[in-house]
Amino acid sequence: MNLKAITLMQFDSNGRLRHLLTLEGLSRHTLLQLLDCAAQNCALGVDPMGKRNVLAGMAVCTLFFEPSTRTRHSFHLAAQRLGADVLNFDASMSSTSKGESACDTLKNLEAMGVRGFIVRHPEEIVIAQLAAVVGEGTVLINAGAGRSTHPTQGLLDMLTLCQAKGNDFSKLKLLFVGDIKHSRVARSNLHALRTLGAGQIRVCGPTALLPHDGLLSGCVVSQDFDAMLEGVDVLMMLRLQRERMEEGLVPSLEHYHANYGLTAARLARAAPDAVVLHPGPINRGVEITDEVADGPQSWILRQASNGVMVRMAVLETLLG
């Protein structure tokens, strides 16, 4: 199933957003609505009294078939703050370890009354398969599918950019560095940035870690990190997705850090007010140094806190 078909599966017969499966194909208006709702959540703070009953009495399930820290727990917190009952699915302790399919798992939980499924899976096609079998009134949210899509990460990164640089992206110079080929975060970010009218998007990484499927069309692409830094407003550092890549694509971690690691010296070559983002988990000393990750230009922890607010916005938009 292609991405266009998956995009269309997100909408009901009236054209309203029913699921969140990918940012590709979402309108600027829809993206801005979700970001505006998330910004309102930020203004309310970590204890939004007025929203405690938005999902009261509703059961949602975090259905994760891959490890997660930030995404899983921020979705859990988001659903709790909206008053939902949250089930945390552990694949290793479930009947999937006995051969049950993801679709059968979802349908059984749906039969028990779960109305919202937040799903992470290593295979891209599974998200589409689940969307095809859920019943009317049940919502599916993609929390990361293989190396193709991670829509809520894309949204929280856009919110963080708005906070750091304002709502007009047209003059921004953004630089993505690292393993773009295997990064679902990069893909979702690039789709969102194009829809929101980003200025110049630069992409840098080893040739073996750059995609050749048209994703980088319109981007400035180079293998020379140092040459790409001048005037950059935003640096998005991406980890090596070693669980998804073939052996030998990178000679060594030391070699990678020497060529693509963000150090304080390299950051000094970007714009003076440049900000650093990283979706996590961070591999310190590989793609980024401690000094930069913990420094004043790092917005990495803001990304983590924004994750809760964005995921609240998605849940209340689809289920509220």
From Swiss-Prot:
Q: Which InterPro entries does the entry link to?
A: Asp/Orn_carbamoyltranf_P-bd, Asp/Orn_carbamoylTrfase, Asp/Orn_carbamoylTrfase_sf, Asp_carbamoyltransf, Asp_carbamoyltransf_Asp/Orn-bd
Q: Write down the chemical reaction(s) this protein catalyses.
A: carbamoyl phosphate + L-aspartate = N-carbamoyl-L-aspartate + phosphate + H(+)
Q: Where does L-aspartate bind?
A: K98, R184, R239
A Gene Ontology molecular function term for this protein is: amino acid binding
Source species of the chain: Xylella fastidiosa (strain Temecula1 / ATCC 700964)
Query: Which pathway, metabolic or otherwise, does it act in?
Result: Pyrimidine metabolism; UMP biosynthesis via de novo pathway; (S)-dihydroorotate from bicarbonate: step 2/3
Q: What does the subunit section of this Swiss-Prot or TrEMBL entry state? A: Heterododecamer (2C3:3R2) of six catalytic PyrB chains organized as two trimers (C3), and six regulatory PyrI chains organized as three dimers (R2).
One Pfam family this sequence matches: OTCace_N
Task: Report residues binding carbamoyl phosphate.
Answer: R70, T71, R120, H150, Q153, G280, P281
**EC number of this enzyme:** 2.1.3.2
Write the protein's name: Aspartate carbamoyltransferase catalytic subunit
GO BP annotations, alphabetical order: 'de novo' pyrimidine nucleobase biosynthetic process; 'de novo' UMP biosynthetic process; amino acid metabolic process
Task: Please give the GO cellular component terms listed in this UniProt entry.
Answer: cytosol
Record function comment = Catalyzes the condensation of carbamoyl phosphate and aspartate to form carbamoyl aspartate and inorganic phosphate, the committed step in the de novo pyrimidine nucleotide biosynthesis pathway.
**Does this entry carry the keyword Lipid metabolism?**
no
Q: Which UniProt keywords apply?
A: Pyrimidine biosynthesis, Transferase
- Gene3D superfamilies to which the protein is assigned, alphabetical: Aspartate/ornithine carbamoyltransferase
**Superkingdom in the source lineage:** Bacteria
**PANTHER family the UniProt entry points to:** ASPARTATE CARBAMOYLTRANSFERASE (PTHR45753:SF6), ORNITHINE CARBAMOYLTRANSFERASE, MITOCHONDRIAL (PTHR45753)
Please give the family membership noted in the entry.
Answer: Belongs to the aspartate/ornithine carbamoyltransferase superfamily. ATCase family.
